[in-house]
């Protein structure tokens, strides 16, 4: 059941219970099914007809996503603007959602804007776009006001690895595909997907690309099947985890491209084949330094 507690309500307009009424409503802070800073609405209601056909435009400002079950402890505020028509109890509306910024685990969104469609408690989001780590993320999804079940699908391109890792020595542009699902209980929220990148470098050591998958449930972020393609071999790990902000690293292997042989990085130090990684790294650094020293301003 939807419930709202509204403060500082201002209502003015023309009321005709035998004809058409025009109302303008403005409120202060509100709570209940949804929490926010204020609502402003214009409404035209035809009392002559059955089901009270209406034309409505409404703006809800400062809406807190967590109050709608959209994430845990997310307080970045959004604005919902919509207009529609139909029987007053069952309006169908079209509108937009905007947020200056949105911070969720592992992702920081800026200038969020997208389209919404509302029909009897069911809300769909489409063509949602935002800036994330120097790139662009697009999204679509659906949300039910009553059950708080939602599904979100994301695609990101051109995400700069230096920004989320806070590591200027690690650079590549990442492409991301992900999904977020919630059954109505925010503690059961699940996010998963895959990522890949083009060429980049770490501490002046170049690599051809990175691929992997991720899974996030509540405060545990897991990465699986992560592979870094380098000139001297494939660096691979089945899993590493970030739990409550702490990194837990799984076994890291080096795979020789020619033989397919794999071994731990520690074992590779004293062996031929994949073991040439150490000497190759040193040669790469030496070569890069020589090239840099030969450049003129």
Protein language model annotation of sequence segments:
Residues 1-224, 233-297:
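Membrane-proximal interfacial segments on either side of biological membranes
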Residues 226-228:
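Active-site/pore-lining binding-face segments in mid-to-C-terminal subdomains
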